[in-house]
Amino acid sequence: MSKIGIIVAMEEELESILDIMDNIEEKEIYGLTFKTGQIEKNKIIVVKCGVGKVNAARVTQILIDTFNVKCVINVGAAGALSPLLNLGDIVIGEKLIQHDFDITAFDHDKGYITGVGDYIYSDIELIEKFKKAANNLKEKDYKIKTGIIATGDIFCTDIEMKNKIFSKFDADCVEMEGAAIAQVCYLDNIPFIVIRSISDSPNGNNEIDFDKFVELASKRCANILREFLK
């Protein structure tokens, strides 16, 4: 039985995971609620970290230190940057970058982190398994893309900002946790992957799109996760 840590940022994302879990129990650590249970034959520990990079990094280290997870999966919603993505499409993060990390004053590219580099790569085996799981699903009214996910402590509603991130990093979507989780896992040598479903469009009304589609995005990620864990 594999022991897998799953991180989400919001309540809608958490509920979608709990809907597919069995034998759920709770453990409180530092004011955070970790839910343990099973999906298929896998032991699962899922936690809602809250929004942002520090919150995400914090729970990642707790999952590794306290629960001894063998891999970490981050699922949830993201905003599209690529014009090729539509609401509900899935992005499997091949590599991640912190678009707001800036030490360009020291002659490094934006996004470069000392001791880490710029792009952090997800585990190749996990990528291939998630691609297979996504393609096994009967629903085909959405695209599945392996690509680049950008992370920053900004909820991007400004079209100009989104275009700059897309242009600079060639990122497919943007969110607020994934690359922080990736950095902790990279430093701790723990396999990880980030899966995002598009909840707002690159040129639409992001706040309206997000509120309307976040539940759909969360359920779609949960369905792919369940297929992956079979």
Role assignments for model-derived ranges:
Residues 2-3, 27-230:
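Glycine-rich phosphate- or other oxyanion-binding loops that anchor nucleotides, phosphorylated ligands
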Residues 2-21:
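Short, conserved "active-site rim" segments that organize catalytic pockets and cofactor/ligand binding
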Residues 20-28:
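Short glycine-aromatic motifs
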